[in-house]
C-alpha cells in the first residue's frame, strides 16, 4: 500500500479487523456541494440547470406589465470577481462576495396589433447586488467574521396522515387527519370530529365541512357519493324488493330470510349471522339476486335522486335516508330501481355522506362564498373575489408550490406510480387525499410516522439562500410591474426598471442575521467540522424549543447511518440539533442517504449503493461485522439484521444489503472516541461535545490511543496546508512553502510554482490561536494532497486536541474528591497545557460635535512612564509586553468648555496649562489581562492623512507581496532556463553572445553567460532558435503578469478604507496572552470524564513507580463505575503499552542497534498482534530509522469505534513492552516514601484542556453600574456586575442572627442610593461607619402595590 509523506514518518498501529470498503467521504461536501449548485458559477447560458439562482430568476421572470404591453424577460446571469480575497476581507471587516450581473431583455409589444406583435427589444446587463461566496472550507466571511450556515431538518412537503393519539376527545377515540404541506403556500388539513364527520381547514383557520371544499371544486352531491361509495341496487317487485347480490357485502349481517340456492337448498337460515364460509357457498352457488322485504331498505341512504317515472318529480333527493313515507311514495309512483349507498360499521363507514348532510351549502357559488368568509371574515364577498381567492389558494403557481420533492412524496403516498407532476394541486389530488383518509378511518392503511427520516428532509445552504433570493426578487417584481407601464412612453432601459436594493437586503439579512447563520465555532479543527455538519430542527419554518415534544427529539430507527444517535447538545436543545453521521449525504430531494454494500444470495459484493430511509425500508440489512469467509460468503446460520426498522435475525440468503463500516452509525466527533463501544451513551455524548471545546495547546501532541479518524478530520478541516499538486520543495521557512511542481502536473503556459503562505499567530473566532508550522524540508518530494504544514491542534497531519498524560487512578488525600483533578508541577513546567489566546482590541477615532478625536502620543496628565511603549503616532510597538491598564493607543477627545473654579484659573495663569479642552479616552489593556502585542492594523478613512505607523505597516505588506512574486518569478525563470539548458547543450551555435560560429555549446559555456545573454545566441537549427524566442517571450510575459499583480495589490492597499459613517480611523491591536494550566481550569478525557484542577503538587510529592517515574495526573477511581465509561480504563492500559513500546524503541535507537533489528521489532508490533498489517518492506533503511525516531515518544495506536482492540490484544501489547499485563503497578507515595497498600492502575490517557478557563471567569467588583429601576448592581462579568445575595443567603444570615451584616447587605451594599454614596465618602475619609437608609427596591414594591389600586404608605415615626 502507498503511504503519504506524513504517514511514512509515523504509522498508526491499526487494530481494526474489517477491511475498508469505502473511504470516509469528504467531510465538508454537504456545504460546498450545496452552494456550488446554488451559484452554478462559470456555467454558460446553455449549461444552466434548473436549480439555485437560475431557478429563482425563472420562477419570477418574465414580468409582464399590468396593461400587458411590455414584458421583462430573464436571459442569464454571470458572477464577477471578488474585490478582496478571504484574508483581506477578515482584516478589513467586509463581506467576501462577488457582484451579480443579470442579463434581462425588455420587450415592448405593439398596442395596435391584435396578435401582440413585438415593437421593440432592449437587452442589458443589470447589477443585482452582491452574493456572498463560500470559502474553500465551507464558511462565509460576513462583515469580517467567519460564519457557518447550519443545515435545517424540516418536514418534507407532501401529504401526511396522522391521528391525535386519542387526546382530543374524552372517550379516547382516535381522530384521524390528513395534512397537505406545500413547499410554499397554504396548508390544507382534513380532520374527523368525534361524530365522524370530515372537516377541512385552510391555514389552520376555522373548520368547514369537507364537502364545502369539494363543492367549491365543482363536484355535485351525486359525483361526491359516486367517488366515495359503491352502491346497492334494489329492483321493486310487487310487495318486496330484490337485491343485486354481491356476496362479500353480506358478511357479518344477520339473515332476514332463509337464503336458498336455485335448487331450494338453504344456505343460511333466517336469524343466523353470515360468515366467510357462507359467503364461499353463496359464491359457488352463483346466486345473482336475493329477495328481501320492503323494510330491508329502511334507514339506508339514496345514492342518486329518485324521480317519478311519469312526472319527473323528485321523490327523494340524493343522500336522503329512506323512510316509510318515501317508500310509500316510491311504491305508489311505480319506481322500478332504487340505488342506495353500501356502508357498514366495519370497513365502509358513512362519513362523507354524513358530512354532506351537515353541509349548509348546495352549489359551487355558495361553497366559494363560505370559504371566502372563513378566510376574510368581515369582507363582503363577491363572486369574482371568491373565485380569485379560491384559485389563488391552491391552483396558482405564483402562490402555491409543492416542489419536486412535495409532488414525489404526494404521489407516492396516495399510491400513484409517476413521481413527477404539477407543482400546484388539482381536483383529483384533493379527492385522492380524502379517499385515503377515509380508507385509513375505515381501517385500511396506516398513519405516517412524522419523525421518520423519509418524512423529514435537509435544507442546505444553497436552498435557503435561493429561497431568500426569491423573496427579494418577488419584492422587486412589484416595483417593476408599476414601472413597466411607463417603459414605452419614456423609453426606459432595463436598468431603470430594476432596483436591486430589496434583493441585496434580503440576501444580506439572511447571511447576517438568520437564526441558522451562526458565528463559527472555531475552538479547534473538530469544532469547525462539526459545526458545518450540524443539522438543526430549529430556525425559520422549523420547530421551536418550547413546542418540540419528546418524540421529535428521540432517536429514531431511521437515524441509523444518517444522523448520529450520540452527538447532540445537553439542555433545552437536546435532540433538536444533531450531527450528520460519518458517511451520510443528501440526495437530490434533500433526504439523508447512507451507503450499503450489495449482498446477492448470501455473497457480499463490493458494489456500494446510497439509500434514503424510504428506499431502505424493504431491505434486509446486515451489520458491517457479519462474519464472512475468504470468498465473501456470509457463514453464520442466522445473521443479525435490520428489517422494516426492527432489529432481528434472518438466514444469510435473505440478506440484501450490508453496512459499509461499523463507524457509519456515529458522527465525526463520536468516531474519535477510542473504545466508544465500552462507554455509556450519556457519557459518550459529553465526550463528543467536550472534544469540541478543547483549546489548542502550545505544542500539539498526537493521541497515543486514537481511532484512525484523526487524519481525516485534520485533512478535511482545512487547518493544515495540503499540497495542491505534487513536486519538490524548493524553499521553506516559518511563513511560506514554495513547491516546484512536478513536470507531469504542470499545465502548459503556467508557472510550475505553488506558493503556500502559512497563517501565523492569527486570532480565531473564539480568541484561540491559529498558527501553521511546516513539516517538510527543502528537497523533499511531495505528492498531491500530502500534508505539508500542521495547523492548530494537529500533529503530523493528525488531529491532536490534547496531551498524553501519565495518570494513576487512586484516591489521594481528598485532592481528587468529586471529580477534582490533581496535577503534577511538571505539567506546568513542561508547558503541556499552556495555550495562547489572542485578543483583538479596537480603538475608534470618530468625528464628534465638538471636533475630531485624535490618535496621538500627546495625552494630557499622563506621565512619561505610561507612554514608553507607544511610538510617535501614539500606537503601541509590536512586541511590547503590556499589563492591565497600560495604554495601547493614545487618543484624545475634545470636550466642551467647563466653568473653571478660581483655584483652577490661578493654576492655569501660573503654569499656562493648555490641555484642558481635551480628555484622555485612550485604549487601555482591560483588567486581568497581560500579554504581548503581536500585531497592529491601522485603517484610515479616504481623504484623511495617514500616520507614519500606517505607512510603515503598508510598506511591510508590500515587501511581503513583492517577495512572494519575486520568488515565483525566480522559480519560473530557473525552470525555463533548466529546460533550455537541456535543449541547447550538445548543439552548435551560429554566433551571438560573443560565441564563434560552429562553437559547441557545453554546460561551461552556458555557465559563463548571464541569463539575459542566452537569448542573443543564434543556433544552427531553426527549431532551437524558435525555442529561445518562445522562452524569452514567456519570461517577459510572466514578468509583466507579476508586475500587474503587484500593482493591483498595491492599489488595494493604498486606497482608503471603507469605514462606518463618522469614523476617521480605526486601530486594531492584537494581544497574545499566554495561559498556563492552574487550579480552577476545566479538563476532560474523551469519555465524558470531566473535572476541575484542584491542586498542582510538586513533582517530588507525586506517587512514583519502582523506576522513580512520577505520575502527572491523579484521577479518582470512583468516577468510573457509576458513570459506566469503562472506555477510559482500556484507553489507559493501551496507552501504557504504546508508551512502553516507544521507550523500548528509544533504547534501541540510542544503543545504535542495526536497522534489521529495528525492522524486526517494528514488524512484531505492526504485523504480529491483531489488526491490519503494514507493508514495512516497502520502507528503505533510512525511512525505517526516521520512523523509529518518530516513535520514540510512543507508538500511536488506532482502535476504531465498534471494531477496536480486544482485551487479549491489549495484553499482548503490554507483554511486548515488558510491562505487567494487569496494567497495574506498585506505587510509592512521594511525600512519605511509603508504598501504597495495593497496586494502582497506571497508564497514559489523552487529556484535554477545555475552553472554560478560570482566568475568564474570575471577576470582582467594588462599585459599578446599577440597574435603572431597582438601583441594584447588574449581574454578570460582562456587565461588571456584582454577586447576587439571594433569598437563601438571607435565610442563612437570619439563621446566624447576623442582623447588622444582613442590614448592610440589603442596604448600603445594594440599593440604598444615598447610603452607598455616603459610605463611599466615609471610606475615602477613613471613617468606616455606615448609615443605612431606605432600599430603592422597597419603593418599587410600594409603587407596584399602588398600581393595583391599594393606597399604601410607610409610617416613619
UniProtKB/Swiss-Prot annotation:
SUPFAM superfamilies given in the database record: beta and beta-prime subunits of DNA dependent RNA-polymerase
Record keywords: DNA-directed RNA polymerase, Nucleotidyltransferase, Transcription, Transferase
GO molecular function: DNA binding; DNA-directed RNA polymerase activity; ribonucleoside binding
Its EC number(s): 2.7.7.6
Catalytic activity field: RNA(n) + a ribonucleoside 5'-triphosphate = RNA(n+1) + diphosphate
One GO CC annotation: DNA-directed RNA polymerase complex
InterPro entries noted in UniProt: DNA-dir_RNA_pol_bsu_ext_1_sf, DNA-dir_RNA_pol_bsu_external_1, DNA-dir_RNA_pol_su2, DNA-dir_RNAP_su2_dom, DNA-dir_RNAP_su2_hyb_sf, RNA_pol_bsu_bac, RNA_pol_bsu_CS, RNA_pol_bsu_protrusion
Membrane spanning stretches: none
Domain of life: Bacteria
GO biological process entries: DNA-templated transcription
Quaternary context: The RNAP catalytic core consists of 2 alpha, 1 beta, 1 beta' and 1 omega subunit. When a sigma factor is associated with the core the holoenzyme is formed, which can initiate transcription.
Family from the record: Belongs to the RNA polymerase beta chain family.
Record's function text: DNA-dependent RNA polymerase catalyzes the transcription of DNA into RNA using the four ribonucleoside triphosphates as substrates.
Protein name per UniProt: DNA-directed RNA polymerase subunit beta
Amino acid at each position: 500500500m502507498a503511504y503519504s509523506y506524513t504517514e511514512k514518518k509515523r504509522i498508526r498501529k491499526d487494530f481494526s479487523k474489517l477491511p475498508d470498503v469505502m473511504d470516509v467521504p469528504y467531510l465538508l461536501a454537504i456545504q460546498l456541494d450545496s452552494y456550488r449548485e446554488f451559484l452554478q458559477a462559470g456555467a454558460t447560458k446553455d449549461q444552466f440547470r434548473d436549480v439555485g439562482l437560475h431557478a429563482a430568476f425563472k420562477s419570477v421572470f418574465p414580468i409582464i406589465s399590468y396593461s400587458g404591453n411590455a414584458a421583462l424577460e430573464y436571459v442569464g446571469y454571470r458572477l464577477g470577481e471578488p474585490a478582496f480575497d478571504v484574508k483581506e476581507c477578515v482584516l478589513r471587516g467586509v463581506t467576501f462576495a462577488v457582484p451579480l450581473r443579470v442579463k434581462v431583455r425588455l420587450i415592448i409589444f405593439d398596442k395596435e396589433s391584435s396578435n401582440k406583435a413585438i415593437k421593440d427589444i432592449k437587452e442589458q446587463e443589470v447589477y443585482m447586488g452582491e452574493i456572498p461566496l463560500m470559502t474553500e472550507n465551507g464558511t462565509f466571511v460576513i462583515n469580517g467574521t467567519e460564519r457557518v450556515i447550519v443545515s435545517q431538518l424540516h418536514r418534507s412537503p407532501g401529504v401526511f396522515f396522522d391521528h391525535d393519539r386519542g387526546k382530543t376527545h374524552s372517550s379516547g377515540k382516535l381522530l384521524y387527519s390528513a395534512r397537505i404541506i406545500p413547499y410554499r403556500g397554504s396548508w390544507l388539513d382534513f380532520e374527523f370530529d368525534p361524530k365522524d364527520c370530515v372537516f377541512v381547514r385552510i391555514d389552520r383557520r376555522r373548520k368547514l365541512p369537507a364537502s364545502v371544499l369539494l363543492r367549491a371544486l365543482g363536484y355535485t352531491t351525486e359525483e361526491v357519493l359516486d367517488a366515495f361509495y359503491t352502491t346497492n341496487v334494489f329492483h321493486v317487485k310487487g310487495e318486496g324488493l330484490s337485491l343485486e347480490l354481491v356476496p362479500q357485502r353480506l358478511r357479518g349481517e344477520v339473515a332476514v330470510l332463509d337464503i336458498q340456492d336455485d335448487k331450494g337448498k338453504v344456505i343460511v337460515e333466517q336469524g343466523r349471522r353470515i360468515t366467510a364460509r357462507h359467503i364461499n357457498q353463496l359464491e359457488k352457488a352463483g346466486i345473482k339476486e336475493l329477495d328481501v322485504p320492503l323494510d330491508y331498505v329502511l334507514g339506508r341512504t339514496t345514492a342518486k335522486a329518485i324521480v317519478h317515472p311519469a312526472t319527473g318529480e323528485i321523490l327523494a333527493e340524493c343522500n336522503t335516508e329512506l323512510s316509510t313515507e318515501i317508500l310509500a311514495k316510491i311504491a305508489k309512483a311505480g319506481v322500478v330501481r332504487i340505488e342506495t349507498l353500501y356502508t357498514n360499521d366495519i370497513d365502509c363507514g358513512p362519513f362523507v355522506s354524513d358530512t354532506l348532510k351537515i353541509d349548509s351549502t348546495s352549489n359551487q357559488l355558495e361553497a366559494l362564498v363560505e370559504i371566502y368568509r372563513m378566510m376574510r371574515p368581515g369582507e363582503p364577498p363577491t363572486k369574482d373575489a371568491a373565485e380569485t381567492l379560491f384559485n389563488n389558494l391552491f391552483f396558482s403557481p405564483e402562490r402555491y408550490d409543492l416542489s419536486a420533492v412535495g409532488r414525489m412524496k404526494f404521489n407516492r403516498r396516495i399510491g400513484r406510480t409517476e413521481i413527477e407532476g404539477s407543482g400546484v394541486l388539482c381536483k383529483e389530488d384533493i379527492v385522492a387525499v380524502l379517499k385515503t383518509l377515509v380508507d385509513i378511518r375505515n381501517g385500511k392503511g396506516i398513519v405516517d410516522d412524522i419523525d421518520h427520516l423519509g418524512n423529514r428532509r435537509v435544507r442546505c445552504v444553497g436552498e435557503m439562500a435561493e429561497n431568500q433570493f426569491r423573496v427579494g426578487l418577488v419584492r422587486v417584481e412589484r416595483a417593476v410591474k408599476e414601472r413597466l407601464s411607463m417603459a414605452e412612453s419614456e423609453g426606459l432601459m432595463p436598468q431603470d426598471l430594476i432596483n436591486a436594493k430589496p434583493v441585496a437586503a434580503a440576501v444580506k439579512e439572511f447571511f447576517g442575521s438568520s437564526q441558522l447563520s451562526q458565528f463559527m465555532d472555531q475552538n479547534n479543527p473538530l469544532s469547525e467540522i462539526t459545526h458545518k455538519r450540524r443539522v438543526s430542527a430549529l430556525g425559520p419554518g422549523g420547530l421551536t424549543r418550547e413546542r418540540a415534544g419528546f418524540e421529535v427529539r428521540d432517536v429514531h430507527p431511521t437515524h441509523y447511518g444518517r444522523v448520529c444517535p450520540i452527538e447532540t447538545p445537553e439542555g433545552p436543545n437536546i435532540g433538536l440539533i444533531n450531527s450528520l453521521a460519518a458517511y451520510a449525504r443528501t440526495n437530490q430531494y434533500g433526504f439523508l442517504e447512507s451507503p450499503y454494500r450489495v449482498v446477492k444470495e448470501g455473497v457480499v459484493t463490493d458494489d456500494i449503493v446510497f439509500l434514503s430511509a424510504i428506499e431502505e425500508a424493504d431491505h434486509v440489512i446486515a451489520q458491517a461485522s457479519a462474519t464472512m469467509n475468504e470468498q465473501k460468503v456470509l457463514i453464520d446460520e442466522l445473521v443479525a439484521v435490520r428489517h422494516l426498522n426492527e432489529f432481528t435475525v434472518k438466514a444469510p440468503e435473505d440478506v440484501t444489503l450490508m453496512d459499509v463500516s461499523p463507524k457509519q452509525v456515529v458522527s465525526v466527533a463520536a468516531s474519535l472516541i477510542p473504545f466508544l463501544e465500552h462507554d455509556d451513551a450519556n457519557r459518550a455524548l459529553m465526550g463528543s461535545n467536550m472534544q469540541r471545546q478543547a483549546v489548542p495547546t502550545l505544542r500539539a501532541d498526537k493521541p497515543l490511543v486514537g481511532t484512525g479518524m484523526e487524519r481525516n478530520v485534520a485533512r478535511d478541516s482545512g487547518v493544515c496546508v495540503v499540497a495542491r499538486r505534487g513536486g519538490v520543495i524548493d524553499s521553506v521557512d516559518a511563513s511560506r512553502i514554495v513547491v516546484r511542481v512536478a513536470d507531469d502536473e504542470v499545465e502548459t503556459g503556467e508557472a510550475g510554482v505553488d506558493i503556500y503562505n502559512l497563517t501565523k499567530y492569527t486570532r480565531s473566532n473564539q480568541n484561540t490561536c491559529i498558527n501553521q508550522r511546516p513539516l517538510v524540508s527543502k528537497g523533499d518530494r511531495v505528492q498531491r494532497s500530502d500534508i505539508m504544514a500542521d495547523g492548530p491542534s494537529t500533529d503530523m497531519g493528525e488531529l491532536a486536541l490534547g496531551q498524553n498524560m501519565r495518570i494513576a487512578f487512586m484516591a489521594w488525600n481528598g485532592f481528587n474528591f468529586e471529580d477534582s483533578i490533581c496535577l503534577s508541577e511538571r505539567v506546568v513546567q513542561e508547558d503541556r497545557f499552556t495555550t495562547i489566546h489572542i485578543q483583538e482590541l479596537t480603538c475608534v477615532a470618530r468625528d464628534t460635535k465638538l471636533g475630531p478625536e485624535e490618535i496621538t502620543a500627546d495625552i494630557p496628565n499622563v506621565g512619561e512612564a505610561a507612554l514608553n511603549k507607544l511610538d510617535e503616532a501614539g500606537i503601541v510597538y509590536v512586541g511590547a509586553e503590556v499589563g492591565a491598564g497600560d495604554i495601547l493607543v493614545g487618543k484624545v477627545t475634545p470636550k466642551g468648555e467647563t466653568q473653571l473654579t478660581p483655584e483652577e484659573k490661578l493654576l492655569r495663569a501660573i503654569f499656562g496649562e493648555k490641555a484642558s479642552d481635551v480628555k484622555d479616552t485612550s485604549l487601555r489593556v482591560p483588567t486581568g489581562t497581560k500579554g504581548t502585542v503581536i500585531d497592529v492594523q491601522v485603517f484610515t478613512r479616504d481623504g484623511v492623512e495617514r500616520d507614519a505607523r500606517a505607512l510603515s505597516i503598508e510598506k511591510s505588506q508590500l515587501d511581503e507581496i513583492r517577495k512572494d512574486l519575486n520568488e515565483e518569478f525566480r522559480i519560473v525563470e530557473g525552470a525555463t532556463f533548466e529546460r533550455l539548458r537541456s535543449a541547447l547543450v550538445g548543439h552548435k551555435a551560429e554566433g551571438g553572445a560573443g560565441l564563434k560560429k560552429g562553437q559547441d555549446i557545453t554546460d561551461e559555456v552556458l555557465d559563463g553567460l548571464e541569463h539575459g545573454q542566452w537569448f542573443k545566441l543564434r543556433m544552427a537549427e531553426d527549431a532551437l532558435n524558435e525555442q529561445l524566442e518562445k522562452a524569452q517571450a514567456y519570461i517577459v510575459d510572466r514578468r509583466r503578469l507579476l508586475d500587474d499583480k503587484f500593482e493591483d495589490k498595491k492599489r488595494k492597499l493604498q486606497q482608503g478604507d471603507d469605514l462606518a459613517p463618522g469614523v476617521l480611523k480605526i486601530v486594531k491591536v492584537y494581544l497574545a496572552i499566554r495561559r498556563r494550566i492552574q487550579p480552577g481550569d476545566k479538563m476532560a478525557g474523551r469519555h465524558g470524564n470531566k473535572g476541575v484542577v484542584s491542586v498542582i503538587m510538586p513533582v517530588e510529592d507525586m506517587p512514583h513507580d519502582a523506576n522513580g517515574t512520577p505520575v502527572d495526573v491523579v484521577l479518582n477511581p470512583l468516577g468510573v463505575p457509576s458513570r459506566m465509561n469503562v472506555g477510559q480504563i482500556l484507553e489507559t492500559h493501551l496507552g501504557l503499552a504504546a508508551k512502553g513500546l516507544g521507550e523500548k524503541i528509544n533504547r534501541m535507537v540510542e544503543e545504535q542497534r542495526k536497522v534489521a533489528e529495528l525492522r524486526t521489532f517494528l514488524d512484531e508490533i505492526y504485523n504480529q498482534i491483531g489488526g491490519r498489517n503494514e507493508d514495512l518492506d516497502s520502507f528503505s533503511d533510512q525511512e525505517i530509522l526516521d520512523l523509529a525516531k518518530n516513535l520514540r515518544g510512543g507508538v500511536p495506536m488506532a482502535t476504531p469505534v465498534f471494531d477496536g482492540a480486544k482485551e487479549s490484544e491489549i495484553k499482548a501489547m503490554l507483554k511486548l513492552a515488558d510491562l505487567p499485563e494487569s496494567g497495574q503497578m506498585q506505587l510509592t507515595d512521594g511525600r512519605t516514601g511509603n508504598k501504597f497498600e495495593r497496586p494502582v492502575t497506571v497508564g497514559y490517557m489523552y487529556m484535554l484542556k477545555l475552553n472554560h478557563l478560570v482566568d475568564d471567569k474570575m471577576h470582582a467588583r467594588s462599585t459599578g453600574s446599577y440597574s435603572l429601576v431597582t438601583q441594584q448592581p447588574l449581574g454578570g462579568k460582562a456587565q461588571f456586575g456584582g454577586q447576587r445575595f439571594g433569598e437563601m443567603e438571607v435565610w442563612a444570615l437570619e439563621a446566624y442572627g447576623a442582623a447588622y451584616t444582613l442590614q448592610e447587605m440589603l442596604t448600603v451594599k445594594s440599593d440604598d442610593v444615598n447610603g452607598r454614596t455616603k459610605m463611599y465618602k466615609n471610606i475615602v475619609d477613613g471613617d468606616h461607619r455606615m448609615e443605612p437608609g431606605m432600599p430603592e427596591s422597597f419603593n418599587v414594591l410600594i409603587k407596584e402595590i399602588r398600581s393595583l389600586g391599594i393606597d399604601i404608605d410607610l409610617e416613619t415615626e
